[in-house]
Amino acid sequence: MNKLFEQRMQKLLQNDYPAFESALNQKPIKSFYLNPLKHGSIEHLNSAFLTKHPYINDAYFYDYENYQLGKHPYFNCGLYYIQEPSAMAVANCLDFDHDDYVLDMCAAPGGKTCFTASKLSSAGLMIANDINKLRDWYFILKMLNVLVFKIQL
């Protein structure tokens, strides 16, 4: 760990720093959610490496050391989207109606945008600014209610 960062965190967290340091040394938790627009199902995936997310519908944790979901053909077809649990929680907690217009000014890498758009109906619109010209998740996931701009602010 960078010494300057470590010193700053020790000063900021004080007595809570050991818990923070311990958390940094834990194995990361990986997750994904099923794309509702593809009517995906986990039946096609190896359930031995999957655990249902306790709070988010159609979301699962997976053992990334033994099951490489990012290399699976269903990932490239948009059946599911791999996303960190903390990022998934943000979009899941947003209070919006299914026909709202939602603006994401910092849509890189696009996971929260995709998750939010999947919760909107066809009457809703997700407007995203994603500066990566090579990224096409919205197309792969067949999200027709997403309008993407590539504006560097």
Task: Kindly label every feature range from the protein language model.
Residues 1-153:
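S-adenosylmethionine
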